[in-house]
């Protein structure tokens, strides 16, 4: 065979081998495709799985991962909204541990901090927020002049995360209001802000920031509400509203609200009682509130109601009196106000009932809004004596306090089958007790624990006057 024939022969063999190899590749690919197709059609309707299938032929070994995820259209699942439920009692408490302190007045001497009053705290499942009524002004600014006034068109309800000084950069607008309450039902936030003239004030209800309902003053005499959190359970929220004199018989309504809409209301028949600025908390299937008697009582009135708005009323029996001004501790009353010449006026406050016992929060001073302490009276809900079983100091009597109120952290947040009781204390600075042109406050908050705690003084601590006051 001559060289040319050898070349032709080698070329022909190469072409044949190449052709055979190509055909084998095509055959292998077809085999893979048909095998995959058959497996998909045979397993249609079975759960998805990941299988490893090995294919062999004379030319190569191919290991292919085949995922049996044949086309299925599934609607995206929407997680169920969690609502606060009823049925939990208050968690056992031996004392009170600090939760937060905002130091707003100290920081405000050189920072952009709102002039505020009536701060309160409320918690959703995911966060706790400080709500407060601004005066449309900042500390150490000319617009802070005259902010001792309670009701003005510049007052708004705003909120910020707990433990921070309330400023324009961290605060959220909630409502135009000079009296307010707010609470979460779990999925959303309810706010109720009251504004307008004294004789025709209107309450504007919002759910997640959208106006959902209104309520007009029904007695034409400074309709007002809690200045602390409302209470939500089983998709409904509850609050109390007062209309009428601050120093005589007034009129009261319990409101039942769902997603910002008033779905029930009941007038409270409370002749001889005076309910203002109630501090409320969930208790089993009920809501319990301890309020301010600005008319005659140095002891605090209470109201308990259920989801049907059936209610009971009374006064905290204990001779450890909770209001300010007040007489020295003595003999209390379960059904009527204790006056002793000190019952008129008052300050917002709170108590927590534990069976026959009661934790009472109160100022240390009998006459002025200064100092603060928590007193445990083991029989104070049913007995009128003045015996107490322990005191925890919160603010010493040389430093200003102010309003105080309750809030709670629910089992949906903590995972516990009980409700954690908590409280906040406002520390008012400026007018009328100090030589400034303004009135504002900071706040501190504590929660109940069933472990060790301590007494101390956690005052506001700001050095006054500010530059604007000089």
Swiss-Prot record:
The chain crosses the membrane at residues 7-29. Substrate binds at residues 117, 151, 276-277, 292, 369. Disulfide bonds join 91-418, 123-128, 183-230, 232-237, 278-291, 280-289, 317-334, 422-447. Residues 36-88 are annotated as: Hypervariable stalk region. GO terms for molecular function: exo-alpha-sialidase activity; metal ion binding. Signal peptide: none annotated. Inhibited by the neuraminidase inhibitors zanamivir (Relenza) and oseltamivir (Tamiflu). These drugs interfere with the release of progeny virus from infected cells and are effective against all influenza strains. Resistance to neuraminidase inhibitors is quite rare. The active site is at residues 150, 403. SUPFAM superfamilies: Sialidases. GO terms for biological process: carbohydrate metabolic process; viral budding from plasma membrane. Pfam families: Neur (PF00064). Residues 1-6 are intravirion. Its main location: virion. Residues 90-470 are annotated as: Head of neuraminidase. Glycans are attached at residues 50, 57, 62, 69, 145, 399, 417. Its cofactor is Ca(2+). Ca(2+) binds at residues 293, 297, 323. It comes from the Viruses. It is found in: Virion membrane; Host apical cell membrane. Keywords: Calcium, Disulfide bond, Glycoprotein, Glycosidase, Host cell membrane, Host membrane, Hydrolase, Membrane, Metal-binding, Signal-anchor, Transmembrane, Transmembrane helix, Virion. Its EC number is 3.2.1.18. The influenza A genome consist of 8 RNA segments. Genetic variation of hemagglutinin and/or neuraminidase genes results in the emergence of new influenza strains. The mechanism of variation can be the result of point mutations or the result of genetic reassortment between segments of two different strains. Homotetramer. This is Neuraminidase. The gene is NA.
């Amino acid at each position: 065979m001559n060289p040319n024939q050898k070349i032709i022969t080698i070329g022909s063999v190469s072409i044949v081998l190449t052709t055979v190899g190509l055909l084998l590749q095509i055959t292998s690919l077809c085999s893979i495709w048909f095998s995959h197709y058959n497996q998909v059609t045979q397993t249609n309707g079975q759960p998805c799985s990941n299988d490893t299938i090995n294919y062999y032929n004379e030319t190569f070994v191919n290991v292919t991962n085949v995922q049996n995820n044949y086309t299925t259209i599934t609607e995206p699942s929407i997680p169920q909204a969690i609502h606060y439920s009823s049925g939990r009692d208050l968690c056992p408490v031996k004392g009170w541990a600090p939760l937060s302190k905002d130091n707003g007045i100290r920081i405000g001497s050189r920072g952009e901090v709102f002039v505020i009053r009536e701060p309160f705290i409320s918690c959703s499942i995911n966060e706790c927020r400080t709500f407060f009524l601004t005066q449309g002004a900042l500390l150490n600014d000319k617009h802070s002049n005259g902010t001792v006034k309670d009701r003005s068109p510049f007052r708004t309800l705003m909120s910020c995360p707990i433990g921070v000084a309330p400023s324009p950069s961290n605060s959220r607008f909630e409502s135009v209001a000079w009296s307010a309450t707010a609470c979460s039902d779990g999925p959303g936030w309810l706010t109720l802000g009251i504004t307008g003239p004294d004789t025709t004030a209107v309450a504007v209800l919002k759910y997640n920031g959208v106006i959902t309902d209104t309520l007009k003053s029904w007695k034409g005499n400074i309709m007002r509400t809690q200045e602390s959190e409302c209470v939500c359970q089983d998709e409904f929220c509850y609050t109390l509203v007062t209309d009428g004199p601050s120093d005589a018989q007034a009129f009261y309504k319990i409101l039942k609200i769902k997603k910002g809409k008033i779905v029930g209301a009941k007038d409270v028949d409370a002749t001889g009682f005076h309910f203002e600025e109630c501090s409320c908390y969930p208790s089993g299937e009920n809501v319990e509130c301890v309020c301010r008697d600005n008319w005659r009582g140095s002891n605090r009135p209470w109201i308990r109601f259920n989801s049907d708005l059936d209610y009971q009323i009374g006064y905290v029996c204990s001779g450890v009196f909770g209001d300010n001004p007040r007489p020295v501790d003595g003999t209390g009353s379960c059904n009527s106000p204790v006056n002793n010449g000190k019952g008129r006026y008052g300050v917002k406050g709170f108590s927590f009932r534990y069976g026959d016992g009661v934790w009472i929060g109160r100022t240390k001073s009998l006459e002025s809004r200064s100092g603060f302490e928590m007193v445990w009276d083991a029989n104070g809900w049913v007995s009128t004596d003045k015996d107490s079983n322990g005191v925890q100091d919160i603010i010493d009597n040389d430093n200003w306090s102010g309003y105080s109120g309750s809030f709670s952290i629910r089992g949906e947040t903590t995972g516990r089958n009980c409700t954690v009781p908590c409280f906040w204390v406002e520390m008012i600075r400026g007018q009328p007790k100090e030589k400034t042109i303004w009135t504002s406050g900071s706040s501190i908050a504590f929660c109940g624990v069933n472990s060790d705690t301590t007494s101390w003084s956690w005052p506001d601590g700001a050095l006054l006057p500010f530059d604007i006051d000089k």
